């Protein structure tokens, strides 16, 4: 069967759908390449000029690395005409009226992440006080939270196979993993695991969790909050790098996603 088998109107609708899909796919590809390249360049600048990680310059550049997904998303959104100005961009990202479910999920996702890890006995408690959590929490807005604007709010919405949730999350997890590599090449950064397979699996699990949350959110704030909570709770308890337990940790969000997002 080809386009000749359809009526003229049906052919036009199919062509429009294909054009829109290709357009979204191109945007997603160019966004990913731009964000990855920009992060790599900034990372190399840090390694060349601030290798010891003890100056104000490397701190500012490290913050910039974490902001690149949001900055690139803002540039793409405005250039493509999806938002008319920076003000409208921030309004769509931060000032949407979210459902009660999205807020509940934002707090429940860290419970899932650490709760399953505790049940699997794959957590090491650091011994830090609860005060350390509250002191670190604001910093995670810059060191992780705002990257959700790029990954969930922008690129997740632009992947061409938008109705195929699992496929979309698999692709997004690869991009997110590649983006982290220049960051974890910095000598003073401690990654979740020095084993890239385990590190990717941890990213894969969080991709499904945050991705599912975005399906119920309009803006990026619920995803930002969930990301900040997971990062901040690491001050109190660290998920360990046991491959078997990490696989089980990933299986749960994958199965839930397969149940609720069947395509």
Language model feature labels by segment:
Residues 26-35, 57, 61-68, 101-105, ...:
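Alpha-helical transmembrane segments of integral membrane proteins
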Residues 35-36, 119-124, 135, 173-178:
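Short acidic/polar alpha-helix capping motifs at helix-coil junctions
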Residues 42-43, 117, 179, 183:
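C-terminal TM-helix exit segments that contain a strictly Trp-centered aromatic cap at the helix terminus
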Residues 53-60, 83-152, 156-162, 188-195, ...:
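Juxtamembrane helix-loop-helix connectors linking adjacent transmembrane helices
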Residues 134-263:
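Transmembrane helix-loop-helix hairpins at the membrane interface
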């Amino acid at each position: 069967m080809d386009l000749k088998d359809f009526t003229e109107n049906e052919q036009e609708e199919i062509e429009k759908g294909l054009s829109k899909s290709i357009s979204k796919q191109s945007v997603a590809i160019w966004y990913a390449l731009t964000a990855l390249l920009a992060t790599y360049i900034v990372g190399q600048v840090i390694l060349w000029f601030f290798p010891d990680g003890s100056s104000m310059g490397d701190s500012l550049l490290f913050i910039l690395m974490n902001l690149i997904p949001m900055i690139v998303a803002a540039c793409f959104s405005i250039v493509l005409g999806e938002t008319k100005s920076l003000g409208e961009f921030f309004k769509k990202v931060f000032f949407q009226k979210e459902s009660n479910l999205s807020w509940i999920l934002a707090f429940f996702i860290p419970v899932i992440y650490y709760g399953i890890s505790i049940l699997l006995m794959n957590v090491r408690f650091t011994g830090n006080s609860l005060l350390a959590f509250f002191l670190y929490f604001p910093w995670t807005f810059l060191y992780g939270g705002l990257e959700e604007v790029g990954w969930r709010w922008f690129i997740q919405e632009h992947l061409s196979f938008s109705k195929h949730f699992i496929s979309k999350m698999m692709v997004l997890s690869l991009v997110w993993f590649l983006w982290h590599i220049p960051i974890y090449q910095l000598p003073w950064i401690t990654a979740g695991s020095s084993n890239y397979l385990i590190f990717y699996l941890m990213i894969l699990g969080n991709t499904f969790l945050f991705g599912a949350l975005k399906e119920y959110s309009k803006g990026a704030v619920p995803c930002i909050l969930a990301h900040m909570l997971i990062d901040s709770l690491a001050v109190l308890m660290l998920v360990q790098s046991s491959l078997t337990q990490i696989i089980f940790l990933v299986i749960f969000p994958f199965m839930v996603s397969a149940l609720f997002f069947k395509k």
